[in-house]
Amino acid sequence: RSRRQRQMCIRDSFKAYSDDIGFDPVDLSDHPVQLAPEHIEALKKIVGEQNVSTTDYDRLSVAYGFTAYDILRLRHKRVDSVPDVVLYPETTGQVEQIVAYSTEHHIPLYVYGGGSSVTRGVEPVKGGISLDMRRNFNKVISFNEIDQTITVQAGMSGPDLEKTLQSAPELFGAKRQYTCGHFPQSFEYSSVGGWTVTRGAGQNSTYYGTIADIVLSQKYATPIGTIQTSHYSREATGPNLNQIMMGSEGTFGVLTEVTLRIFRWMPQNRKRFSYIFKTWDAAMKAAREMMQCECGYSSVFRLSDPEETNLMLKLYNVDETPLQPLLDKFGYKDMERCLFLGFTDGEKGYSRNVARNIAKIALKHGGMPLTGYVTRSWEKGRFNDPYLRDTLMDFGITTDTLECTVNWSNMEQVHADVRKICHALPNTVVT
């Protein structure tokens, strides 16, 4: 076939999916703007006409988060809730004025950060105003190398924050590069404000802590005025307002500014490791000893049960490497073995010693080293699962994850109970 014929064939093959891949125009004729024109004009005076939108596309773009339910509704063109107007504030002062105005006139107000919410917290169920923080509300307010802190507007994205910190010598005249240390799976499409108000945890939280450990101070625009928490890391009095505000998901006000701890970025000191254990019990005991041995913490610390291990080894092509015959030879059986991987960060000596102690404990519990190959494979795709979910939906498959906090003493029982329930569901694959 000619090149033109092949192109036409490709286009034709997409016709069956043309109503399901988002290329068709957005039409919200069933959801007209309900907010009175005088309110929209007043909002234009606050943020400027260029930062106000009532177009169908912009209204729909902030109406949903990223749960499977949200994505399925969008794919089926089911629109339950949209805001009447979308605002793109530039300054904290503008946000404070918007909050005051919406409070005075009883107008519902919602906030949209990176859009990766899985709690339906961004859905404007009562219409009104949606503040889209992505376009303009994403600037650095201050950088303090002595205190090792940075203050940013709440709409700054994870990648932009990390790029800024790693460019600190060029941008701020800093002596070295820095990192925030917070890398949730939603990193590429989430904001600093979103991390804070959802009290998130990242993939490197074993070493750097969750966002509750990283945030030092917050500023909110509320119906009763501005709330600014203390800039100190610890206080002798309580309750701790900083901790109360984190996790509030916008119920107390609009988060405008966040001060974060930052850490020295030393990727050259990173030590990657991966081990395979013969059983889930041995893997759990090894992991617990690693965390309780008082010899430091790795940055990434991931343990997979037999089912997830089976999938991950295939994804990382381990079954096509010389490692597979070795696993079979030494009795690491499929659907019994468990994968453990991670890496250490920090000062050179610290990073090296943590990795050494992890190796010592892993070998004690029968772990077999798999080199850093598996960990590097995981790193390459650490933020890819959401993309995989969307692709699988094209084939009628819906994927999702479960999260919970456990103690070491009830970890095995919770794991067994959750697996039992999931396996009992029809047409369900558990990994």
Where does each model-flagged region fall?
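Short beta-strand elements
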Residues: 131, 135, 216-220, 243-247, ...
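Low-complexity, highly charged intrinsically disordered N-terminal segments
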Residues: 11, 22-60, 64-65
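Glycine-rich N-terminal segment of FAD-binding domains in flavoprotein oxidoreductases
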Residues: 35-38, 54-136
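FAD-binding subdomain of flavoenzyme oxidoreductases
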Residues: 139-302
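C-terminal substrate-recognition/cap domain of FAD-linked oxidoreductases
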Residues: 11-16, 49-72, 284-431
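Single conserved hydrophobic/aromatic residue that forms the stacking wall/gate
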Residues: 1-6, 10
